[in-house]
Amino acid sequence: MFGDHKQFPWSMGFQPHTQGETRVYGRYLAQNYPNAKIGVLYSSDGLGRDNITGFKQGLGDKVGNILVEQTYEATDPTIDSQLVKIRTSGVDVFANFTTPKFAAMAIRKTAEMGWKPVHILHGISLSIETVLKPAGLENAKDLITSNYLKEYGDPAWNEDPGMKKFVTFLDKYLPGENKHNSNIAYAYMSAQTMVHILQQCGDDLTRANVLRQAESLKDLELDVLLPGIKVNTSPTDHYPIQQTRMHRFDGVRWQGFGPILELD
């Protein structure tokens, strides 16, 4: 919605748009699990409808592999009944397009049922601190998602200049905060982008020029973005981040695999 430059010319999203993300999952399954029997859980709102639409587009001619779709309301106390219906349908792939609270419920309940499908988790719910730990890290092993951020604590980034700047900033301005919280990395990255935009504005800080500069970002690299992922915008493109990479949870941290993927 926030990337719709025609309807909302003064608004701009930031993270990858949800239809693009779920299209990536659909393509991944079509290519790697062409004979999969798929069950999908998503919210009964605009976000959920975008998720299932993108997913079906990504599956392409494999869309018939979806055997069951279940939805939930944000006010539902549990999603146990939906998960039981999905499991009993005989699927071997579970596309879990839920928000964080319900994602934790789904991960935990799936383990309690002794069910081990190929489990695709929407990137909105990939936080180790707020989703996977409450669900039980042992229950989250082998989850598959996509991500565009470096993960604090991953040894791969111990000597990374961008990660070092991020850690130094938090130690100075937010001492004691949990650096594993991906929401903090997202906020830092958003602020870093805003600083860049304001610097591009120079002395012209009118609304029109701020928007003009926000629409003129070219291959901007941010401290906590994965290598190869860059921010780009234009007057007709209000989606700053349009790249991601597949990840699998090893029981401790997310491990990236495969190339950088373009979202469309």
Which residues fall in each region the model found?
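Extracellular/periplasmic periplasmic-binding protein-like sensory domains
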Residues: 8, 110-186, 260-262
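Solvent-exposed loop/turn segments at secondary-structure junctions
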Residues: 1-3, 18-19, 44-48, 72-77, ...
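Periplasmic-binding protein-like
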Residues: 38-42, 90-100, 106, 117-123, ...
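Structural motif
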Residues: 21-24, 71-85
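Segments of small-molecule ligand-sensing domains
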Residues: 172-185, 195-254
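Sec-exported extracytoplasmic/periplasmic mature domains
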Residues: 30-35, 56-64, 84-91, 108-115, ...
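Extracytoplasmic ligand/sensor domains, especially the bilobed periplasmic-binding protein
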Residues: 1-70, 119-145
